[in-house]
Amino acid sequence: MSNLPFTVAALYCFAPLPQYESLREPLAQLCCANGIKGTLLLAAEGINGTVAGSAGAIEKLIAHITAIPGLGEPELKYSHASEMPFHRMKVRLKREIVTMGVEGIDPLKSVGTYIAPKDWNALIADENTVVVDTRNDYEYAIGTFEGAIDPQTRTFREFPEWVKQNRDRLEGKKIAMFCTGGIRCEKATAFVKGLGFDDVYHLKGGILKYLEEVPREQSMWNGECFVFDERVAVGHGLAESDVELCRACRRPLTPQDKLSQFFEEGVSCAGCYAERTPEDRARYAERQKQVKLAEKRGANKHIGS
């Protein structure tokens, strides 16, 4: 049991939800009434999201979601935060609950073999296994598993094309995939199996479940795991990390990254300095000035974030 005041729940479930639009308002009302913040995505293929609130509030929400007809038990990962990691509550209607952009991908029909965290090390240590990080390049940059391939994608939509262009690296191998919480791998493994590969595996519960269950001394994870909230990243035991966001480009920054000559809080980092014009940086600098003034007044921290 954590002493931190906020419970963070990352959840998803693939299930046919033909009337998903009607679920939006009841979910939004329940979350607002119980002080829950975060994002929930609803689509005809299921539900996905990460939310935070008191333990009791999150328990109510999960009970509500589990009771939705046809949905069943969602895949759930819990962690904790010292401060509310979200600024508002959003319940959105989408075409996909995780956007791959490939028609006909259905994890309910075909998906890779799930590997429990306790068995993951043995799989990725096998010399006949190719380990693929299905996340984006900025996530890979701050942490990944030993020997994992970085597809260097900026969005998950780019992943299918990477697979097609790198078939030769996967042929004749066991293909082990992983992502933050497991949902991207549901579609990634379904896509790869659809191309004719048979030995396709993915980490059940994702990196978050691995970091929760596998002791640091046995871990093959290096670095931090990026999360899409104000904690920015978590480490072993799902402890909060010292990684921060560049408020200009939203890239994660380690303490070492902040030593770069191109880093200026709220204005630029080494990753985005060359991508921005002097006018952009001047605008960001003014915004950062307003953020600091607002903080002094005790206003909301998320101005400009």
Swiss-Prot record:
One of its GO terms (molecular function) is oxidoreductase activity, acting on paired donors, with incorporation or reduction of molecular oxygen. Pfam families: Rhodanese (PF00581), UPF0176_N (PF17773). Disulfide bonds: none annotated. The active site is at C179 (cysteine persulfide intermediate). Keywords: Oxidoreductase, tRNA processing. The keyword Repressor does not apply. SUPFAM superfamilies: Rhodanese/Cell cycle control phosphatase. PROSITE patterns: RHODANESE_3. Gene3D superfamilies: 3.30.70.100, Rhodanese-like domain. GO terms for biological process: tRNA modification. Coiled coil: none annotated. The keyword Oxidoreductase applies. It catalyses: uridine(34) in tRNA + AH2 + O2 = 5-hydroxyuridine(34) in tRNA + A + H2O. It is an enzyme of class 1 (oxidoreductase). Residues 125-219 form the Rhodanese domain. Its EC number is 1.14.-.-. Catalyzes oxygen-dependent 5-hydroxyuridine (ho5U) modification at position 34 in tRNAs. Belongs to the TrhO family. PANTHER family: RHODANESE-LIKE DOMAIN-CONTAINING PROTEIN 7-RELATED, THIOSULFATE SULFURTRANSFERASE/RHODANESE-LIKE DOMAIN-CONTAINING PROTEIN 2. This is tRNA uridine(34) hydroxylase. The gene is trhO.
